[in-house]
């Protein structure tokens, strides 16, 4: 999609929104959802379920600028597609939420977090401009210093109450081909939190640079911090896209190596923290995890 075709899509969406009867509840027409909560199909208006806006035209990466280290993408662009587009240039979004089907707009208006957040905060902190469809049908370009600065500051984590993000411009950061992981065990949450404090203060842990940090708690007295660092070389590369499950390696291996792309999606194959809750932990996994991902992604909370 080009800038011109994007503008055409914006105009068509505005027309579709304007054609809705006043007071009609609205929701986005999306093939998948990553909302981890129960909800009614509604909200329901006086004549039935909410109207659905077709936003499929806003799921494209519009531009990657490797010199300025920025990307311009539609709000419905999945992080998988966004990461693939930026990794070609040796760049990635400053925060990449852990599931491939999470969208850029969803992570901004919802709440996205990942293992670079200790350095880079939340996804919205990399946004420099947003194009937002508001409740009164306007499309506004909001930045930190223009006339819509209040909307720019208030939109993150507003869960769709202020409008829908049609496109966003975000900052990117450089990457290296591999990530070197080290898994550190802890016997209590207190000890684990103390270690996180050290990493936040020093940017490293036990002499190892901390480009990525996340934690896994198996029991109250068995916790692990995984500290990752970019690397140009890897003596081996693990593969967790099939039957080998990443979370099991956390307590088994002291260190590991992944390609940067495989690292970004290390949790995506089985979503272990929620799969048993929706009866998918028994599922036979395909080579690339697509069967299970498709099944889970089709479950609408």
Can you annotate each of these PLM segments?
Residues 1-301:
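Noncatalytic alpha-helical scaffold of FAD-dependent oxidoreductases
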């Amino acid at each position: 999609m080009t800038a011109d075709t994007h503008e055409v899509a914006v105009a068509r969406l505005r027309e579709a929104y304007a054609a809705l009867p006043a007071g009609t509840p609205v929701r986005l027409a999306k093939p998948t959802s990553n909302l981890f909560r129960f909800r009614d199909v509604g909200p329901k208006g006086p004549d039935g379920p909410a109207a659905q806006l077709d936003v499929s035209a806003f799921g494209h990466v519009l531009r990657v600028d490797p010199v300025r280290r920025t990307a311009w993408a539609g709000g419905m662009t999945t992080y998988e597609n966004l990461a693939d587009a930026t990794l070609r240039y040796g760049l990635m979004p400053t925060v990449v939420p852990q599931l491939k089907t999470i969208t850029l707009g969803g992570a901004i208006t919802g709440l996205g977090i990942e293992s670079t957040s200790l350095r880079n905060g939340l996804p919205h902190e990399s946004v420099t401009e947003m194009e937002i469809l508001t409740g009164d049908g306007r499309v506004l370009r909001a930045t930190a210093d223009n006339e819509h600065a209040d909307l720019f500051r208030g939109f993150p984590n507003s869960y769709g109450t202020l409008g829908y993000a049609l496109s966003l411009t975000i900052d990117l950061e450089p990457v290296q081909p591999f990530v070197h992981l080290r898994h550190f065990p802890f016997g209590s949450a207190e000890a684990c939190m103390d270690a996180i404090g050290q990493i936040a203060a020093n940017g490293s842990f036990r002499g190892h640079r901390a480009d990525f940090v996340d934690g896994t708690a198996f029991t109250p007295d068995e916790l692990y911090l995984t500290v990752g660092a970019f690397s140009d070389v890897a003596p081996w590369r693990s593969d967790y896209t099939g039957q080998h499950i990443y979370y099991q390696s956390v307590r088994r291996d002291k260190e590991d190596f992944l390609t940067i792309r495989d690292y970004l999606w290390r949790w995506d194959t089985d979503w272990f923290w929620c799969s048993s809750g929706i009866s998918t932990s028994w599922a036979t996994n395909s080579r690339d995890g697509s069967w299970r991902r498709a099944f889970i992604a089709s479950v609408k909370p």
